[in-house]
């Protein structure tokens, strides 16, 4: 709608398709964690501009045991406190989780990041993002209760299948009875 008011036209495609194509063409986005590190402060903007291609690239990096993206959790020595590089990615996923359309994919990415997260100095971790997104009394998503419940169940099943990692996201299971739907 805004592109119409700004009289922004792209021949042969919508402006969203144009932006998606640009993000898809970023070299290394789907196979080099260093790009995510270098773009850390811009990742929320990139994710909001082209959610599909952003999630596609991240899901590619998270394939297998996540070794391709695990280095973003490394902490560098800072002047006073250590510096970590995962915050921009986490904030991008939190922003996408507000939209029901992207909630499942964002939640799965956060859960996979939580599984490979070795912990560290900061308490603001991917697991805490999942908690705040699905918080029963104040969820950080616009998705209705039924959708949130279904996603929590899918996450529980998905990570049960992966085996040995379910304990990290086991906090989700008790939330299901707390989130009651209206009859």
Feature-to-residue mapping (PLM):
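Non-catalytic all-alpha helical scaffold/repeat segments
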Residues: 1-183
């Amino acid at each position: 709608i805004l592109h119409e008011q700004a009289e922004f036209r792209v021949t042969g495609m919508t402006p969203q398709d144009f932006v998606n194509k640009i993000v898809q063409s970023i070299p290394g986005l789907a196979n080099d964690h260093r790009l995510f590190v270098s773009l850390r402060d811009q990742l929320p903007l990139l994710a909001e501009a082209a959610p599909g291609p952003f999630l596609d690239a991240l899901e590619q990096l998270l394939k297998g045991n996540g070794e391709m993206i695990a280095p973003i959790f490394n902490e560098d020595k800072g002047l006073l406190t250590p510096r970590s590089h995962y915050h921009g990615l986490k904030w991008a996923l939190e922003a996408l989780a507000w939209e029901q359309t992207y909630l499942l994919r964002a939640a799965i990415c956060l859960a996979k990041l939580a599984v490979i997260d070795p912990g560290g100095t900061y308490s603001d971790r991917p697991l805490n993002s999942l908690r705040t997104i699905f918080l029963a009394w104040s969820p950080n998503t616009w998705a209705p209760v039924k959708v949130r419940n279904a996603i929590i169940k899918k996450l529980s099943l998905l990570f049960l299948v992966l085996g040995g990692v379910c304990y990290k996201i086991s906090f989700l299971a008790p939330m299901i009875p707390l989130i009651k739907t209206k009859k």
